[in-house]
Swiss-Prot record:
Protein's gene: argS
EC identifiers of the protein: 6.1.1.19
Protein name in the entry: Arginine--tRNA ligase
Subunit comment: Monomer.
CDD domains noted in UniProt: Anticodon_Ia_Arg, ArgRS_core
SMART domains: Arg_tRNA_synt_N (SM01016), DALR_1 (SM00836)
Annotated Gene Ontology cellular component terms: cytoplasm
Localisation per UniProt entry: Cytoplasm
Catalysed reaction equations from the record: tRNA(Arg) + L-arginine + ATP = L-arginyl-tRNA(Arg) + AMP + diphosphate
Alphabetical list of NCBIfam families matching this protein: argS
InterPro entries documented for this protein: aa-tRNA-synth_I_CS, Arg-tRNA-ligase, Arg-tRNA-synth_N, Arg-tRNA-synth_N_sf, ArgRS_core, DALR_anticod-bd, Rossmann-like_a/b/a_fold, tRNAsynth_Ia_anticodon-bd
The organism of origin for this protein: Salmonella newport (strain SL254)
Chain location of the short sequence motif 'HIGH' region per the record: 122-132
Keywords in alphabetical order: Aminoacyl-tRNA synthetase, ATP-binding, Cytoplasm, Ligase, Nucleotide-binding, Protein biosynthesis
Amino acid sequence: MNIQALLSEKVSQAMIAAGAPADCEPQVRQSAKVQFGDYQANGMMAVAKKLGMAPRQLAEQVLTHLDLSGIASKVEIAGPGFINIFLEPAFLAEQVQQALASDRLGVSQPTRQTIVVDYSAPNVAKEMHVGHLRSTIIGDAAVRTLEFLGHHVIRANHVGDWGTQFGMLIAWLEKQQQENAGDMALADLEGFYRDAKKHYDEDEAFAERARNYVVKLQSGDTYFREMWRKLVDITMTQNQITYDRLNVTLTRDDVMGESLYNPMLPGIVADLKAKGLAVESEGATVVFLDEFKNKEGDPMGVIIQKKDGGYLYTTTDIACAKYRYETLHADRVLYYIDSRQHQHLMQAWTIVRKAGYVPDSVPLEHHMFGMMLGKDGKPFKTRAGGTVKLADLLDEALERARRLVAEKNPDMPADELEKLANAVGIGAVKYADLSKNRTTDYIFDWDNMLAFEGNTAPYMQYAYTRVLSVFRKADIDEQALASAPVIISEDREAQLAARLLQFEETLTVVAREGTPHVMCAYLYDVAGLFSGFYEHCPILSAENDAVRNSRLKLAQLTAKTLKLGLDTLGIETVERM
């Protein structure tokens, strides 16, 4: 149940009945403060201005047409014309019952769409580093949310598996194999790439061979394709270990690398020329875009084919968008790529729209994100100033969590401790990132992310186990509880119930905006409200069985909401801590 949508519809009908235009926006929002009710309709100002009347006068007229019987206990006008809506306790009780009766907690399913989500995108023959973390986990949280809502989601892992560097890498792999050290060299991808580059820079004969190999690979030579495939396979096998550790849903089947679009590139260049969008300029093929200006104020030239016949990332991204619409039949495409790529993507998509490859009705959305910074406010690095490998970061998270868990549970069996440390350590790294607005840079801080206070994974995981512990102590007859009514008579019961019933609204925002931090803030709020409810509304020592069972049901919905919400973020919950 989406209460916000229900109220929006009711207020909108009342506004139209009061003389507002049919497309009026009621602007129903969740209230920021308890004294303003559960929801506020803020749309009177804008509409009253169009109608040439005072907002408060319009609000009064709207109230005469607004029928919220059975939904709201009180509706009042505040300030210049805000309408405050206080939900009826009996309505809240009924919605809590319905949510508990459903596996989906009463969350409705929107019209099913095919949504392509482009995320992670590491490079072949390189180990994943911290720079890949944000795209991977934010993209995966979006995917989980969209799938839960019932959409057909296609994960697209746009790996960097093509380019001139592959001549160098194949030549180096060949050299290692001749020395019977091929597999050993590939076990350390980072070292393999570094050694290949060193030889390429220092040995002219090796560099010449590498350049010839690029040509052979690009012409489809079987031997070189096999060597290339070996590099891709070994890299993706290593990456899969990282994905599994991160509890990310990507698999090998989701790889749609740059090489996939190679066969399309000549046709796209020819088509853009035929449509008069691309022209020859200084030997290269260029699309001039009025929408982007260079330093002189002239239309910016975007190169799609170099003088030597080579293609660019832009050409691949044009082909990629076309493929996602024509072949994958996407209704919507989301790209989780860092903010530095924004202009590049906008230029590619401007060409895509002008060429008619993807209609305007299909959104192409750049869900960009900021950087991960160290405590010094500079990009996160190792002590020696190098790039932090993702595997090393996860090892450290596990080690720190292990110490933390062992400290709190000295007698816990080793296997249980390891499982708990994994959930806490990996959860802490992910949640610290997901709980920040993705558009901003954020400071990576071990102490903060592993704290048991504040908006952190350990706090949320602990909050969940705390709710479960109520049930362990209660010794409940599940069937008797299922048929027990929900009674809401205390303010703290009403506040917790109202917030729990905003789960669908929260999912809707995350799905629309691609902002998992909204879910984190919601769950943290729920945990805080439960804490206040637990303190002031005795559950197991309630005055009678009816109140006890009703409060147990509120606790039950809290546990289910926390678990399901954390699951949409890819954060594991545990039964005990």
